[in-house]
């Protein structure tokens, strides 16, 4: 089972693409290591860092920074965000 639920798309999330970052809503029980493994397996790009937070609604959001400078744009194009 994948820990990634769906991409989190807001105006702020789209501005983070310029910083090579993407936001995803993830399973609340998943940890950073599981998130990195799932994203690398799904999209084939190396993750540099992960920041997670739990929202006031109880969902867990992950902000992923990628090593390759164009990875975030490539993934966003693949999943239809751009």
Curated annotation (Swiss-Prot):
GO CC, one annotated term: ribonucleoprotein complex
Pfam families registered for this protein in UniProt: Ribosomal_L23
Keywords on record: Ribonucleoprotein, Ribosomal protein, RNA-binding, rRNA-binding
GO molecular function: rRNA binding; structural constituent of ribosome
InterPro entries hit by this protein: Nucleotide-bd_a/b_plait_sf, Ribosomal_uL23, Ribosomal_uL23-like, Ribosomal_uL23/eL15/eS24_sf
Superkingdom as given in the UniProt entry: Archaea
GO terms (BP aspect): translation
Subunit (UniProt): Part of the 50S ribosomal subunit. Contacts protein L29.
HAMAP family documented for this protein: Ribosomal_uL23_A
Function comment: Binds to 23S rRNA. One of the proteins that surrounds the polypeptide exit tunnel on the outside of the ribosome.
Family: Belongs to the universal ribosomal protein uL23 family.
Name this polypeptide is given: Large ribosomal subunit protein uL23
């Amino acid at each position: 089972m994948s820990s990634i639920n769906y991409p989190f798309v807001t105006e702020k999330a789209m501005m983070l693409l310029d910083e090579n970052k993407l936001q995803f809503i993830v399973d609340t029980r998943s940890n950073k290591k599981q998130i990195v493994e799932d994203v690398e397996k799904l999209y084939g790009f190396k993750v540099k860092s992960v920041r997670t937070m739990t929202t006031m609604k109880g969902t867990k959001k992950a902000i992923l920074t990628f090593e390759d400078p164009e990875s975030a744009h490539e993934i966003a194009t693949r999943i239809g965000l751009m």
